[in-house]
Amino acid sequence: MTTAAGLSGIDLTDLDNFADGFPHHLFAIHRREAPVYWHRPTEHTPDGEGFWSVATYAETLEVLRDPVTYSSVTGGQRRFGGTVLQDLPVAGQVLNMMDDPRHTRIRRLVSSGLTPRMIRRVEDDLRRRARGLLDGVEPGAPFDFVVEIAAELPMQMICILLGVPETDRHWLFEAVEPGFDFRGSRRATMPRLNVEDAGSRLYTYALELIAGKRAEPADDMLSVVANATIDDPDAPALSDAELYLFFHLLFSAGAETTRNSIAGGLLALAENPDQLQTLRSDFELLPTAIEEIVRWTSPSPSKRRTASRAVSLGGQPIEAGQKVVVWEGSANRDPSVFDRADEFDITRKPNPHLGFGQGVHYCLGANLARLELRVLFEELLSRFGSVRVVEPAEWTRSNRHTGIRHLVVELRGG
């Protein structure tokens, strides 16, 4: 099995390598020297298990499009961060850790609660909330864009979609805040909870909310999913545990990844003021700009799968049961697919990025994320013509989320 010499000193499970954002310089070496190679376990690998690391676009796409060979059951999110190598007892119960046929049945059910009509219905509310947040920005005064806007807007929208009562949202933001690694919120009016306490409170709250949606359904996504039936004689409806995992997944996938795209997008525009001015002068470019922001930020940069059978990938022999980690964050900078891959270009077209995934696990909330990005940047750039980064961005120390924890900026008109 290939263990590239040039990569032997690089540990992709050492989160220090991700402390300043996604390490594109390391993955450039990875793509060039060994697109698919065996990553030996290290002291930073929690389960002590090696894995196949995949850095190039073609091979990443091959894995994502073949869910039979590359199983998701032991992949997906990890409750306490960690690395892309940990298995969880909930594997197979949450949507992004399911295989077919149940995955397709559950996905169809969830999709019924996230229709284009429902997304269009929230646009006016989304714009009103975006304007309200921007009203609080004093031109020329430094503020933390992540805490005040990028984290705030997606969380509010997820609460609307799930039917969380307005009176509960303030409490809920504070309860889940530790799990999303937000710090310094202006809403910090209660003692910080540790991650375990936050998870426990969220679980209790979610079950009570689910029970209420079953008893008195409303016009929201959680009501649709909680009362729907599945074409599965062994499990015709979602259990409370599955509904909680769905609730939690929407918070993490719907709030955190959109937060990361918004914050990373503003940073990219600040670092490329010519692109900011081009976009500000022509909002018709917003659709391509949004796709470039998602490619550039790659907010969910890695996925882990397990080979269900022996297979060859990129010329390397993978055995059944071995782990395979694909890095969309690297694939989205593959120069064999993207011209000037390391340049931020809001006019880039075509832009076949993998920022929303691919195949059967393509992001269900992609259109909602696009809407949030479009509305926020449209409103922001209508008011402000320049962005100055006051302090270096503080990144999350993670190889599964490319996120900015704090971004202190000044916004000015003109």
From Swiss-Prot:
Superkingdom of origin organism: Bacteria
Gene Ontology molecular function terms on file: cholest-4-en-3-one 26-monooxygenase activity; heme binding; iron ion binding; steroid hydroxylase activity
Alphabetical keyword list: Heme, Iron, Metal-binding, Monooxygenase, Oxidoreductase
Enzyme Commission designation: 1.14.-.-
Cofactor field: heme
Binding sites annotated in the UniProt record for heme: 363
GO BP terms, alphabetized: cholesterol catabolic process
InterPro entries the UniProt entry points to: Cyt_P450, Cyt_P450_B, Cyt_P450_CS, Cyt_P450_sf
Annotated family: Belongs to the cytochrome P450 family.
UniProt cross-references to PANTHER family, sorted A to Z: BIOTIN BIOSYNTHESIS CYTOCHROME P450, P450, PUTATIVE (EUROFUNG)-RELATED
Protein name (Swiss-Prot/TrEMBL): Putative cytochrome P450 126
Organism, as annotated: Mycobacterium tuberculosis (strain ATCC 25618 / H37Rv)
Species lineage: Bacteria, Bacillati, Actinomycetota, Actinomycetes, Mycobacteriales
